[in-house]
Amino acid sequence: MEKFQGYLEFDGARQQSFLYPLFFRDYIYVLAYDHGLNRLNRNRPIFLENADYDKKYSSLIVKRLILRMYEQNRLIIPTKDLNKNLGHTNNFYYQMISVLFAVIVEIPFSLRLGSSIEGKNVKKSYNLQSLHSIFPFLEDKLSHFNYVLDVLIPYPIHLEILVQTLRYRVKDASSLHFFRFCLYEYCNWKNFDSKKKSILNPRFLLFLYNSHVCEYESIFFFLRKQSSHLRSTSYDVFFERILFYGKIQHFFKVFVNNFSALLGLLKDPFLHYVRYHGKYILATKDTPLLMNKWKYYFVNLWQCYFSVWFQSQKVNINQLSKDNLEFLGYLSSLRLNPLVVRSQLLENSFLIDNVRIKLDSNIPISSIIGSLAKDKFCNVLGHPISKATWTDSSDSDILNRFVRICRNISHYYSGSSNKKNLYRIKYILRLCCVKTLARKHKSTVRAFLKRLGSGLLEEFLTGEDQVLSLIFPRSDYASKRLYRVRVWYLDILYLNDLVNHE
């Protein structure tokens, strides 16, 4: 991003906060292309959606695109030309525009973020970026709460809602009109042939989604701060998680007047909000009546302000002492551990019954077995079967694939309270690996293991234990507790990498 700023120093568009002229600069396309190549996700460039984009990209195509953008009528795809090469050419241009728009529109956000934290002693903690970093927080906080709202974030069904949401953050009217034009043209092409693959860049779609969610969170956090007796934590501390740019004066004029009666009913200083994977949870120590009021508030917020039809069935009220909470691949619930404490006062001794509340995070074994059965690792009952599609690979390749999957699952579910389900998953993968190798060599499992020996599966038994042995001291007592301890790793950034075994 510093390279972008260096070029924009000589461009008058930046001084006037105009982004639209940047679409007609050749160097912006080059920088965006280079910026995408340097940011890899799962060994693939984020800038590229498929391999053909790299082959088609050239300076000549960029110049043609800029000439077409000077005359937007040439970017419109007539219905009669949707099946011709002209439609495919324009679709490729829209793909380039979506990539460029995502890169350009991030420039004012990065500049604003840099100026907001300039001079402040804000420390970056990369451990907070891990998926496992939230579980210690939940173990500390949820044990004191009673209810959790599990809400599925609705998506806008109309494109104009996305444009209006982006209007609060992008002040350039020309860029918004151009964005609306390209978005509607893409949807017309998509509606004509629904089987076509999306041409919009994933980074561009992620930016639209984050803008939509940020608009909702800015309203919610403002109302939450107004309705609470305690002062909320400044959002600058969490700049790595949420880029929150609130419109406080606008909210104060509109929402305080409309929700003045409701704010008095939602006063609760003990409230925690966590967003993940298109959902969010709201943990509180309220009564069932107040939880239903929160549910009513969220339904009306989405329907009235965002004009999105939001069904109340998408808001689940879970009682932690009775219900399980599905969170980031875990099933979490509260467990009561009775404790008996012996107390002695002078010569009199007596027993005190005490109950300790603990948050248990277990493995959803049924859903994982269903996923393994879908990928042909086992049947629906959990019995291992051979992976027929992998028999054409070499023995080392087959073994490495199974070992990678087994280690990734063990790595992610290392914080489970019940290790038996994890051992069952490992057993399925180990036996599936043996059956796959035996099928390749046209032999039985017993004869194959007898011929190669037990050293074949040593790769499954090592790896995770070596990591744990570096964390805990090497003693007999520690080795006995090695398979029962719960470990949360702070290096898991992407959940899709854990299941990427191809």
From Swiss-Prot:
**Which BP terms from GO are recorded?**
mRNA processing; RNA splicing; tRNA processing
Q: Which GO terms describe its cellular component?
A: chloroplast
Q: Where in the cell is it found?
A: Plastid, Chloroplast
Which Gene Ontology molecular-function terms are recorded?
A: RNA binding
**Alphabetical list of InterPro entries matching this protein:** Domain_X (IPR024937), Maturase_MatK (IPR002866), Maturase_MatK_N (IPR024942)
Which keywords belong to this entry? Answer: Chloroplast, mRNA processing, Plastid, RNA-binding, tRNA processing
Q: Which Pfam families does the record associate with it?
A: Intron_maturas2, MatK_N
The cross-references to HAMAP family, in alphabetical order and at most eight, read: MatK
The entry assigns this protein to a family as follows:
Belongs to the intron maturase 2 family. MatK subfamily.
Q: Describe the function of this protein.
A: Usually encoded in the trnK tRNA gene intron. Probably assists in splicing its own and other chloroplast group II introns.
According to UniProt, the name of this protein is: Maturase K
Organism lineage: Eukaryota, Viridiplantae, Streptophyta, Embryophyta, Tracheophyta
